[in-house]
């Protein structure tokens, strides 16, 4: 009997992953807290035909119009409390704090037809990426400020205010070109709450005590998004863009533990490259009754 030449040729697949991370945090004072985190992941997969795929993800800080410069660097977060003690803020705020956070990632993948000539390691990745650029199949670099700046204020007379500005930028690159995405958003919320009550005389019952809570919430959101593309990886052209903003007011009330409701109104505007300008308005109300038997 003739033996097939394919017998025993399927060697299966091989998968290897290496992960490393470092975390640190420090409290400089009762009001200042800083934390940092760095993570790097390496992955290698080889199938039975000898095709090898490698990928790497690590924390990264990029700069330049095309995010083509940068260095491995940990993400960080920063929080500052006690701003209500500052000379101007203490005049109107009962409590105040500020936040800031950054995270950036670099992700790359390669493909080798007959196996890679060498293995990546944590300390010489830059040399590996430069030497085998022709084998690179995709890369992504993104940086995210979430928030770039965030403020939390509690004012007198039960008024609270929040503000957030988030920014992100990403670069996706393939052998055929690259895409850059820019996003920017502003979010603010103001809330006023009043708690009170009333006494209503009821015949043959006595006095009926009604405790009520009324709150007013005002929101404002602004979002901007812009995509740029380049086939030659040098000259950029706008691919798509969108801008939108909305504001809304909601009044909520609670007359007792069994009766609550609210009224809301929202106005929205948006403008995109494909659909143009659009305006929406929304009005509604709700009533909630708790019935128990």
Regions found by a protein language model. Give the residues of each.
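Exposed, low-structure sequence patches enriched in small/polar residues
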Residues: 1-293
């Amino acid at each position: 009997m003739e033996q097939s030449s394919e017998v025993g040729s399927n060697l299966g697949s091989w998968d290897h992953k290496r992960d490393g991370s470092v975390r640190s945090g420090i409290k400089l004072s009762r009001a200042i807290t800083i934390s940092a985190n760095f993570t790097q992941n390496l992955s290698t997969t080889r199938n039975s035909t000898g095709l090898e795929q490698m990928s790497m993800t690590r924390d990264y800080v990029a700069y330049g119009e095309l995010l083509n410069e940068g260095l491995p660097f940990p993400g960080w977060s920063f929080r500052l409390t006690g701003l209500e003690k500052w000379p101007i803020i203490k005049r109107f705020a009962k409590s105040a704090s500020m936040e800031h956070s950054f995270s950036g990632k670099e992700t790359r993948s390669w493909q080798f037809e007959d196996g890679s000539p060498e293995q990546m390691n944590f300390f010489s990745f830059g040399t590996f990426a430069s030497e085998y650029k022709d084998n690179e199949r995709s890369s992504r670099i993104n940086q995210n400020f979430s928030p770039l700046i965030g403020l939390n204020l509690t004012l007198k007379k039960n008024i609270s205010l929040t503000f957030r500005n988030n920014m992100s930028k990403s670069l996706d690159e393939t052998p055929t070109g690259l895409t850059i995405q820019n996003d920017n958003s502003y979010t603010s919320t103001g809330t006023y709450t009043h708690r009170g009550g009333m006494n209503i005389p009821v015949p043959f019952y006595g006095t009926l005590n009604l405790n009520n809570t009324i709150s007013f919430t005002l929101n404002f959101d602004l979002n901007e998004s812009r995509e740029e593309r380049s086939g030659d990886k040098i000259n950029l052209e706008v691919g798509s863009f969108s801008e939108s903003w909305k504001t809304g007011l909601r009044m909520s009330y609670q007359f007792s533990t069994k009766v609550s409701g609210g009224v809301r109104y929202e106005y929205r505007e948006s403008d995109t490259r494909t659909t143009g300008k659009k305006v929406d308005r929304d009005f509604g109300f709700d009533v909630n009754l708790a019935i128990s038997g």
